[in-house]
Every structure is written in C-alpha cells, then in structure tokens.
Amino acid sequence: MLAQRTLKSLTKAVGVGLHSGQRVELTLRPAPPDTGIVFRRVDLPQPVDIVISAQAVTDTRLASTISAGGAKVHTVEHLMSACAGLGIDNLYIDITAEEVPILDGSASSFVFLLQSAGIELQSAPKRFIRVLKPVEVREGEGATAKWARLSPYEGYKLSFEIDFDHPAVDSTGQRVEFDLSSGSYSRDIARARTFGFTKDVEMMRANGLALGGGLDNAIVMDDYKVLNSEGLRYNDEFVKHKILDAMGDLYLLGKPLLAAYSAFRSGHAMNNKLLRELLAHQDAYEVVTFADEKRAPQGFATLARAW
C-alpha cells in the first residue's frame, strides 16, 4: 500500500511575516490519518482551525490566504509547497499570528524542518486526485494573456513559463519543467526564493506590505541587476520559484495531484481558479489509491531525499 504520511515528532520555527513584518511562531505536529493539513490560530482567544482546501482560499493578492470562522492565515504557499514536495498528507500547524513566516524566502527551511522531525508512514492509503480530462483557465489576450492548465498524466509534472522584460531575468531561463519521477524537489526546486523589484517594494511598503522583506529573504532587483551579493541559487531561480509557488497553491486542493500542470504567467489567483474549475467538473477527475505501491507513479513511493 502507498501510505499516507505525517511527522514522527513535532518541530518549531520562529520568523517574521513577509508582508506584516510580525514575529510569528510555528509548531508543526503529527496528525492522524485522513486529517489533512490543518492550520490552527492559537493566538486567538478561541483557537480556530483552518483545514486546507481550494474553497478555503479567500485572497490571492501577492500570496495565498486561507480563512475559516473569521480567522485568516496569509502566505501559506511556501510551507504547502514543502509539504507537497515531501508528500506530507496529515499535519497540524499551530501559528501565533496571521502570516506564515517567510524564513529565507524559499521552501528549503520548511523542508529542513519537516525532515528534521522525521516522516512517518501511516496505516491508511494515500489518496490522490487523478485528472481524467484537460481543464484550463485563461485571462487576457495578446501581451496580457495568461493561462494555466491541468492535463491527464500518470505522475506529477509541472511546466511554467514567465515573461519578465528585465535584464536580470532575460539572462536566465524563463521556462522550466519539473517531473517528480525524475527530479528531486529538495535539490531542484525548494531553494528558489521569492523575488521582487525595488520600485515595487517601495510602493508595497507605502501600503503596509512587504514590511518583513529584505535581501535575506528575497531576490531583490533594481532596473538592471540582482542586488543580492551572493547572486542566484539556480541559473533559472526566478521561474523555479514560480514552480515552487504553483506546487504550494495546487496542494491546497487537500490531496496530491496525478496530472501535468502547465502555465504561462500564472499566479496565486489563477492557480486557485484552476483548482475550482477542476472541482466544478466531476467527470474531470477521480480519487484513487494504490494498494500496491509498485503500481504507483514513480516519485511518490520513495521518501524525498535531503539535498
């Protein structure tokens, strides 16, 4: 049986929110089979649980925000991406503020946290959502066009293309493909950091956003170059971060996908719109398990390696 996974023990982290600049503590705890991933706002007078789902996403401006019972958690995508990359099905996430800490701006710190706690196989089959027919969402035309698509695929593959007219981005790859069967999430994707431009940061801070952002947790560019003294972690770090974000956004479905995801200039809003479009067509997907893990698509049966 290809089994569900949780943590062997709890693990903690402290950081600041990218947009709020607020100090926040995270405690990641094991959860029973079929729990799913549950954020718990423990700072509130009455703690509120927010179970991840496509419908729980209530805001997609600059990040993915989930809500329930009047409580919110912002910027969940990097932690969700790490859970997707390591195949974590069940997890309690206690959080002391309304934004997940940005840490180093990638998913690598979350991968380290999860792996340091240890990953435990559980006595219940892992449930996948297998895409049976193509589903697509589009916006704009010509130079403003953007789209995202899910297609049938016996595995999990993502391809993404960006289109930034900037010297630092032009000199790197603007398209990348990652297949879970042949690549390593921890090595190939997890270390890609979020990025932004100085002109946008100034505007966001004037609006009370990006208050926790800086050169230690983002790639920052002026009109011509990358300002971080250490440079890039990957030659194509910009577009790889978009893959990282997409994996996190898609994992908000609540189950891992068996599908090929492809996108052009997509973002948090379009990724969530794609999930809702999939769920709106019940003939476009099915829920499957694998009694014999040898029959499962390559890449899901082995625990992800550290880099």
Swiss-Prot record:
The keyword Metal-binding applies. Keywords: Hydrolase, Lipid A biosynthesis, Lipid biosynthesis, Lipid metabolism, Metal-binding, Zinc. Zn(2+) binds at H78, H241, D245. One of its GO terms (molecular function) is UDP-3-O-acyl-N-acetylglucosamine deacetylase activity. Its cofactor is Zn(2+). GO terms for biological process: lipid A biosynthetic process. It is an enzyme of class 3 (hydrolase). The active site is at H268. Catalyzes the hydrolysis of UDP-3-O-myristoyl-N-acetylglucosamine to form UDP-3-O-myristoylglucosamine and acetate, the committed step in lipid A biosynthesis. Belongs to the LpxC family. NCBIfam families: lpxC. This is UDP-3-O-acyl-N-acetylglucosamine deacetylase. It comes from Polaromonas sp. (strain JS666 / ATCC BAA-500).
